[in-house]
Regions:
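Substrate/ligand-engaging "lid" and interaction regions
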Residues: 1-173
């Protein structure tokens, strides 16, 4: 809000309702958008794929796309670095990676060195391009406001899914 007001856009501060709901006159957004939908519509469908970042695919491709994100490329980086960011006193995930060289090195190691060599390629999204985009566009974006505390909340319940598939892939090698 302060950055928008500094550019001359007025009245950008969030409003807090009586029920403690925060309402802002703007949305923090990012360019990367991915929506992978199973193309199984028995009664026909609109041309959903004409939307930016919308991919229509068969069930296997949808599953591979989800696996790429959840078990290798994005979520494991959050799960490994978020709790350490909390312990180190970093509120925002992006700020932590932008200012702490060691945390950025660890995040890159998890995605590039450990994940990419064993991630199944869904064919419609390139795992390499997806990870590159994370580190060049998404992770450094402090306007997203993603907190390390949020990333840490469910880590104990997600260890198996976020790291297990990668470990299993290495065991198979």
């Amino acid at each position: 809000a302060a950055d928008l007001e500094a550019m001359g856009v007025e009245q950008m501060q969030p409003v807090i309702t009586g029920k403690k709901t925060y309402i802002a006159p703007f949305v923090n957004a990012e360019k990367p958008q991915y929506l992978v939908i199973e193309d199984s519509f028995p009664n026909g469908r609109p041309a959903l794929e004409k939307g930016f970042g919308v991919y229509m695919a068969d069930r296997e491709t949808v599953n591979l796309s989800e696996r790429m994100k959840v078990t290798v490329c994005l979520n494991p980086v959050h799960s490994a670095t978020g709790p350490l960011g909390v312990v180190q006193g970093y509120e925002l995930f992006a700020h932590m990676l932008n200012t702490n060289e060691d945390m950025m090195k660890m995040a890159r190691m998890i995605a590039y060195d450990e994940g990419l060599p064993v991630v199944p390629n869904p064919g419609i999204l390139s795992p390499q391009a997806f990870v590159d985009e994370l580190f060049h566009d998404r992770f450094p974006n402090e306007y997203l406001g993603d907190t390390n505390m949020r990333l840490s909340v469910d880590v104990s319940q997600m260890v198996g899914i976020r790291f297990g598939e990668t470990i299993k892939a290495y065991v198979k090698k």
